[in-house]
Amino acid sequence: MLLLSGCSKVTKENYDKIKSGMSYEETVELLGKPEGCSETLGISNCEWKNDDAKIVITFISNQVTITVAEGLK
């Protein structure tokens, strides 16, 4: 039961806290470590998932520039 008490950080509440210009480190503090990231020419796309919920964030120069969410509760 203790494992179930650790709620996912992939929530609408946390998504709403993500602001343009936040650093990658600040974002990881808020959402936890991403499922994965891909990088091309200094642009990173990172993805956080939980069940049907997903947050994708694009970082340029280590700063949030674009955020997309699906299925958040």
Where are these regions (language model features)?
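Sec-dependent bacterial lipoprotein signal peptides
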Residues: 1-6
